[in-house]
A protein has these predicted regions:
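C-terminal transactivation domains of fungal Zn(2)-Cys(6)
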Residues: 147-150, 273-379
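Charge-rich, intrinsically disordered regulatory segments
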Residues: 1-114, 121-124, 128, 466-483
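Hydrophobic, well-ordered secondary-structure elements that form the walls
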Residues: 30, 366, 412
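Structural helix-adjacent loops and short alpha-helical linkers that scaffold large soluble proteins
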Residues: 202, 374-382, 419-428
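Flexible, glycine- and charge-enriched loops at secondary-structure boundaries
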Residues: 3, 153-160, 203-206, 311-318, ...
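Intrinsically disordered, low-complexity acidic/Ser/Thr-rich segments used as protein-protein interaction/activation
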Residues: 78-128, 132-295, 337-353, 381-390, ...
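Residue position in alpha-helical solenoids
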Residues: 170, 216-219, 328, 369, ...
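C-terminal region signature
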Residues: 404-409, 421-484
Length: 484
């Protein structure tokens, strides 16, 4: 027996504490002994000091994640080792702590949503190497976006590169093994978010992960068991499925087709049968607005794509959709909708949820006026909606995770695209900056940069009334804009 133990060797050599030659798919020792050879994800690090690799920090403002005791019941502490006995290096433990207390908080509109995500995902990832590596990569991307260059003395860029290489390999392996459970769906979605948080421009790899989720759901048979019976994971997956829907549906994703069996099947798999048939007018505790409104946004996107060459059909559908959204606004003004959430809301949270929902209604009106009625920014209906949104934003709790502010990317960007005077632009830039600090993701910085470029082009073209639609300019500028 050798005293030199391989840190990247197979399970059998590690169990026998001997040096492994790390040949794949079968190492030399296992091949000679005719034993089964298996490699698992190993959280290993070299002792070398990795040089900082030119991180982008010009836009970053370092903000620490909220203390865990600020979100009610704190997420479960991260263990020192994985269930299989592998010691968790301090660097990875730091990343998991930030994933739990920082990243998941920045995706949560309320502390109870944060608790749902932590209770469902954290225990599950400790047993799932592909989900664990995706979560670590998302955490690393989040820290990079906040201007950090190292974690426990190691370059975060190097961490992210290592996780992308090993983690995506694990994901491909799991896919070849025909795994189609909720952990696979969560893994693909978290890899999508990791690419979004990293703010990668060029090839939009996050779209590939969204398409992967769609393929998983479309290929799922209704009688198959997607869930594992873990109620905590099921609660987390309900939220993550709505995140998937919103990523597909919100504007400026014109190349992704949101309709199809994946949405209906996902609704059946992650929700009870009654909610799968009808969308509730209640405000969803994860989204910050109603699924009913999300459906309407999907219809607007679909009408824009399918009827662009048939103006009469487009106008008729626009009138129907306008009647629906105005009906929702009138109904909710008379009787404010309830919030679908597992905990009792404070008066402040109740107000913020209602304001967020109403802001999304007005932003949907703007999308309708702009995309289907082709109105310019200076038109009275659009400016009326802009002023309504700005007034409601002033009354919201701003810039905090575990609050509805985390959902504000779409309305802020929508209002920003219609801003055509200095005061409006300054107002929106201030709010987008607060969103960037709150979420800690480079995709928000991309949103800010895109708005400035849209405004510059309109000025260059002397388009002072906002006649040129921002979606045309974004396509020309080749931005990968994602809103959630």
């Amino acid at each position: 027996m050798t005293n030199h133990r391989s840190r990247r060797g197979c399970e059998e050599c590690r169990r026998r504490r001997r040096k492994c030659d790390e040949l794949k798919p079968t190492c030399g020792h296992c091949n000679a002994a005719n034993r089964s050879c298996r490699y698992e994800l190993r959280l290993v690090w070299s002792d070398r000091k990795v040089q900082h690799r030119g991180l982008r920090t010009t836009h970053c403002r370092l903000v620490q994640p909220p203390p865990l005791d600020s979100v009610g019941q704190s997420p479960a502490p991260i263990p020192d080792s994985l269930p299989n006995g592998v010691i968790l290096p301090r660097r990875y433990k730091k990343l998991l702590e930030y994933f739990s207390g920082g990243v998941l908080a920045s995706l949560s509109s309320h502390p109870s949503i944060h608790q749902d995500l932590c209770r469902g995902l954290i225990p599950k990832m400790l047993y799932s190497p592909h989900l664990l590596s995706a979560s670590l990569a998302l955490s690393a991307a989040g820290l990079l976006s906040r201007g950090l260059s190292e974690v426990e003395g190691t370059s975060i860029s190097y961490v992210l590169e290592h996780l992308q290489s090993s983690g995506l390999s694990l994901l491909r392996k799991a896919l070849t093994e025909q795994r189609k459970d909720e952990v696979m769906v969560a893994t693909c979605l978290i890899w999508c978010l990791a690419d979004v948080f990293a703010g990668i421009q060029g090839v939009p790899s996050w779209r590939i992960h969204l398409q992967g989720i769609k393929a998983l759901l479309d290929g799922h048979q209704p009688d198959d068991q997607l869930g594992t019976g873990d109620t905590a994971m099921e609660s987390a997956m309900r939220h993550l499925f709505l995140l998937y829907r919103s990523l597909q549906t919100l504007p400026y994703l014109q190349t992704i087709e949101p309709s199809g069996p994946s949405v209906d099947l996902g609704q059946t798999l992650f929700f009870d049968s009654s909610s799968a048939l009808t969308r509730s007018p209640k405000i969803d505790g994860f989204l910050g607005y109603s699924e009913e409104l999300l459906d309407l946004l999907q219809h607007i996107n679909s009408a824009t794509r399918n009827n662009s060459d048939h103006q009469f059909s487009l106008n008729a559908e626009a009138d129907i959709l306008l009647g629906k959204i105005n009906g929702m606004i009138s109904r909710d003004a008379k009787t404010p909708p309830e919030v679908s959430i597992s905990s009792t809301l404070s008066p402040q949270y109740s107000r913020d949820f209602l304001l967020c929902h109403q802001i999304f209604q007005q932003a949907t009106l703007i999308q309708l006026y702009r995309q289907l009625y082709m109105m310019p920014s200076a038109s009275r209906p659009i400016q009326s909606a802009v002023q309504a949104i700005n007034g409601m934003i002033q009354n919201m709790t701003q810039g905090q995770p575990c609050n509805t502010w985390v959902a504000m990317a779409m309305p802020l960007f929508t209002v920003g695209c219609e801003a055509f005077d200095g005061d409006q632009k300054d107002f929106i830039l201030d709010k987008v900056q607060k969103l960037e600090v709150c979420i800690g993701s480079l995709h928000v910085h991309t949103i800010k940069r895109a708005l400035k470029d849209v405004w510059k082009i309109r000025t260059d073209y002397q388009d002072f009334e906002g006649n040129i639609c921002a979606s045309q300019l974004l396509e020309k500028l080749q931005y990968n804009i994602i809103l959630f």
